[in-house]
């Protein structure tokens, strides 16, 4: 967080006026008010070329970017640039030029121009791999009508409220097993508590959860002996993310030409992801074909196959993308949430009180409990404000639009700097503070176009509802069973590895909460 965990940001706040903390001050560029209609003016818009910029020489900019080790601190760079240039700026790195915005009203205006088939920025090394090796693609990479066709089907099976109800009995036991694992660790340590970095355990938890939802079967990732084939998949996903960053600003044509170790490792990671996902999908596909009746919900794979609204190749491609996207993202958010709770014990007690009251009122019915924990759900939003998975959201507007009195041509890459927004006092009071109650405010203007952790609109994260349910259930069981503390009082900074990760291990202390274990 700013004062405690982000020294750079703290220095910036002291050295520079807060972003938009006073309308019109500290910017040097005209800005209409921050209320309704902010960002829209009746004046003749200024040309795109006048948008503040560090310069139009993309390769020189990229040289300085690399020299300053900007790849892993790009989220801090956004903050610096907004302080320097104002609420909108453009930057060219190599061949890629983007316009960056931060104000929620500008974000709302941008999304009005996303069109029927919103387009995001495709991560170059990912796209290059799929093209070079002719891999099938799902909604992550599809565009226009083919994207829409798949997305409509997935919305029914993955996002709809009726579908989410089916996931509860699949995800809840995984969270309970994670709690059991921690209790075993406490007994093994023999000190009445467990102290450790549970990053790997959270990877296992997330993979066990997403595979259970996809296939309706457990893989045993929370057992004493972890499935080695499943571990290879998890390791490959980690390597895929980690090797993406050095390749982001390199022209894809050079990947195969120079065959650098980073590119070879990236290809090997994707190969493993596809091979393992194909293997799992085929095994469960054949198993499902042999069954005629199911006592319980059989998983997303079966429902997609049964609906016959997708070709088998498209089903496999989308399953692969959801498996790959469901490990590091959810596990990292949970790690950050535990970190924030451990540093804000008063908030942790508020959350625990809500959960325990919900358990009593719902008489143990977990489905009812999920409707009674608004503060807990708000705490997930708060974690994603401070530690968003992606540091920006991207759109290519369908037609010309005006932002901050500048004309933005159609199909310009516009990036919403959600990390910088979440850390700015103009948009969040006391932004350093972990305060879930801010999301329960009756003043909707305080949260308007600020909850962007999962994206927005029809192209928001397809796994959003699964992730929200998975994290809520996990936190319910953790709060009922343990008090979570930091082993050492100190700050943890963030680095950009395509997703935001801690710059060092986070060692947490889990102390059993003095009560009888809740009955499922």
From Swiss-Prot:
State the reactions this protein catalyses. Answer: 6 reduced [adrenodoxin] + cholesterol + 3 O2 + 6 H(+) = 4-methylpentanal + pregnenolone + 6 oxidized [adrenodoxin] + 4 H2O; 2 reduced [adrenodoxin] + cholesterol + O2 + 2 H(+) = (22R)-hydroxycholesterol + 2 oxidized [adrenodoxin] + H2O; (22R)-hydroxycholesterol + 2 reduced [adrenodoxin] + O2 + 2 H(+) = (20R,22R)-20,22-dihydroxycholesterol + 2 oxidized [adrenodoxin] + H2O; (20R,22R)-20,22-dihydroxycholesterol + 2 reduced [adrenodoxin] + O2 + 2 H(+) = 4-methylpentanal + pregnenolone + 2 oxidized [adrenodoxin] + 2 H2O
Question: Under which pathway is this protein filed?
Answer: Lipid metabolism; C21-steroid hormone metabolism; Steroid metabolism; cholesterol metabolism
GO aspect biological process, one term: glucocorticoid biosynthetic process
Q: Which cofactors are named for this entry?
A: heme
Membrane disposition: Peripheral membrane protein
Where is it predominantly found?
A: mitochondrion
Identify the CDD domains for this entry: CYP11A1 (cd20643)
Cite the Gene3D superfamilies for this sequence.
Cytochrome P450 (1.10.630.10)
Q: What is its EC number?
A: 1.14.15.6
InterPro entries xrefs: CYP11_CYP27_families, Cyt_P450, Cyt_P450_CS, Cyt_P450_E_grp-I, Cyt_P450_sf
Q: Which domain of life is it from?
A: Eukaryota
Transit peptide limits: 1-39
Q: Where in the cell is it found?
A: Mitochondrion inner membrane
Keywords for the protein's UniProt record, in alphabetical order: Cholesterol metabolism, Heme, Iron, Lipid metabolism, Membrane, Metal-binding, Mitochondrion, Mitochondrion inner membrane, Monooxygenase, Oxidoreductase, Steroid metabolism, Steroidogenesis, Sterol metabolism, Transit peptide
Q: Tell me the residue numbers annotated for binding heme.
A: 461
Q: Which GO terms describe its cellular component?
A: mitochondrial inner membrane; mitochondrion
Pfam families in the record: p450
A GO molecular-function descriptor: heme binding
Q: What does this protein do?
A: A cytochrome P450 monooxygenase that catalyzes the side-chain hydroxylation and cleavage of cholesterol to pregnenolone, the precursor of most steroid hormones. Catalyzes three sequential oxidation reactions of cholesterol, namely the hydroxylation at C22 followed with the hydroxylation at C20 to yield 20R,22R-hydroxycholesterol that is further cleaved between C20 and C22 to yield the C21-steroid pregnenolone and 4-methylpentanal. Mechanistically, uses molecular oxygen inserting one oxygen atom into a substrate and reducing the second into a water molecule.
Q: Which PANTHER family match?
A: CHOLESTEROL SIDE-CHAIN CLEAVAGE ENZYME, MITOCHONDRIAL, CYTOCHROME P450
Q: Which family does it belong to?
A: Belongs to the cytochrome P450 family.
Subunit architecture = Interacts with FDX1/adrenodoxin.
Q: What protein name applies here? A: Cholesterol side-chain cleavage enzyme, mitochondrial
